[in-house]
Amino acid sequence: MQTAFCRYDLRFKAPAKTSRETLHEKTTYYIKVWDPSDPSRFGIGECALFRGLSADDREDYEDILATLCRRLNSSEPFDISRFSSIKFGLETALLDYENGCCRTPFPSAFTEGKESVRINGLVWMGTADEMTLRADEKIAAGFRCLKFKVGGVDFNDELRIIDRIRCQYPPEKLEIRLDANGAFTPDNAMDRLRRLAVLDIHSIEQPVRQGQWDAMAWLCENSPIPVALDEELIGVDDPDERRRMLYYISPSDIILKPSLCGGFSGATDWIDRAEAQGIGWWVTSALESDIGLNAIAQWTAAMHPSLPQGLGTGALYTNNFTSPLRLHGDMLGFDPAAEWVFPRLQWSL
């Protein structure tokens, strides 16, 4: 088996603003595996590094990928347990290869075009007018669950936007989720959660910055809005530490981003530990291209989730791949008759 990797720079159609930063471009990496006797058949995965957020974000990232490929090509061991994005990409590539090199790492009724996954619409941060327009567009497109990024602009402006949406669409017509990306502080979080709670909010992800277990545990116990852990899961690789954190903080839910929380094997372990403690979960993509998004969507669909999932649609980028993923209203599906179209990629062994 041969292995190679390449870099690819994804370009946003419009700046994507979170409470952490404004994104114009995102660098990602792909890894490919194949049998030298038949190089036309290959498995591919996305090592979806998220600069500034991934636990394996480091200056020598490309050197690590190069070392991994050299080791695999010479049948030498290489420990990738601490490199979540690389683990995510390699797991995808190997499963793709094992399942026929057809970009179906998790074959199911979803990849046969028989089932779809309901997703939420994501409203990025912006001015009040921008966020209102984005919300209206998502609702008009058929979304019955919206997630708002909050914490990046004036809180009172955000509150007014969400209040306007809620007045127009009652809870039985629209579910509203929030994602603070850790933008609140232990001092102001509870006041903000109480003010938001009157708007019938489904949940809020990561209200305060990760690593503050005491503050987060107190919020989870006392918040009028169910609290979900998101960034808190990043970099927690030890199984005992995962169990201890979930027990100590006791969130309502956890948000699973396979490229950030240990690949598919790591995300599965998180699910097992959460369910053992009565904690809910749903899956969210993390700005992957359609290579990574396709794998996440297939993995998610195979678990038959009942809640809307936080999966992207690949529409953020000007230079994404053409894939069989299809969006109909708020249902993400897969067209098995459609073909992948790859740009020219420069692979390094």
What annotation goes with each model-predicted range?
Residues 1-176, 181-183, 187-190, 195-197, ...:
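N-terminal capping/lid subdomain adjacent to the active-site entrance of alpha/beta enzymes
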Residues 8-11, 125, 233, 287, ...:
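Short, solvent-exposed coil/turn elements at secondary-structure transition points
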Residues 47, 206, 311:
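Active-site donor-binding loop signature of nucleotide-sugar glycosyltransferases
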Residues 69-76, 252, 277-283, 305-307:
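A short pocket-lining beta-strand/turn micro-motif at the edge of beta-sheets
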Residues 121, 255, 310-311:
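Structural signal for conserved beta-strand scaffold positions within catalytic alpha/beta enzyme cores
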Residues 153-294, 298, 317-328:
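Catalytic core of soluble alpha/beta enzymes
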Residues 298-304:
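Oxidoreductase and adenylate-handling cofactor-binding alpha/beta cores
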Residues 304-315:
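Short helix/strand-capping turn motifs
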